[in-house]
Amino acid sequence: MAAPSGDGSCEDFTEFQEILRVMRTIDDRIVHELNTTVPTVSFAGKIDAGQTCKQLYQSLQDAHASRDKAIKRCIAQTSTAVNNLQAERLKDSDNLALIKLLRKEQSKLKFLKSELNVEEVVNDRSLKVFNERCRLHYKPPKTE
């Protein structure tokens, strides 16, 4: 399942959300993927469930890391922009266009930070479903 690299622009939050939505396809389809690739008991001998689960786990981890990196990159870029705009506002506190732009960037930063929470929920859900179906076939390495 090829997904965008997450190198899209952080300028347009709506565009960035769309990129994340596409990147979350693997998580959205985890149940279908498990149902079509991990064998039931009656077909257990025909497919190497351990290898299948291992590959799916690696795909999930790669997707999660890619999205996390993209979100954090945009948070860093937007934080820098907010800091720069705040410094400019100190020099020119009457500039309404500057104040409006600062508020826009602050809102975008808040939305980007909320995407980290969304990402945590999506990741937890996917790993829960994965573990329910693959726990007998593959034990992922411990993280953290």
UniProtKB/Swiss-Prot annotation:
Stretches assigned to coiled coil: 82-120
Alphabetical UniProt keywords: Coiled coil
Disulfide feature: none
Highest taxon of the lineage: Eukaryota
Gene Ontology CC terms, in alphabetical order: mitochondrial intermembrane space
Family stated for the protein in its record: Belongs to the MIX23 family.
Designated name of the protein: Protein MIX23
The organism of origin for this protein: Xenopus tropicalis (Western clawed frog)
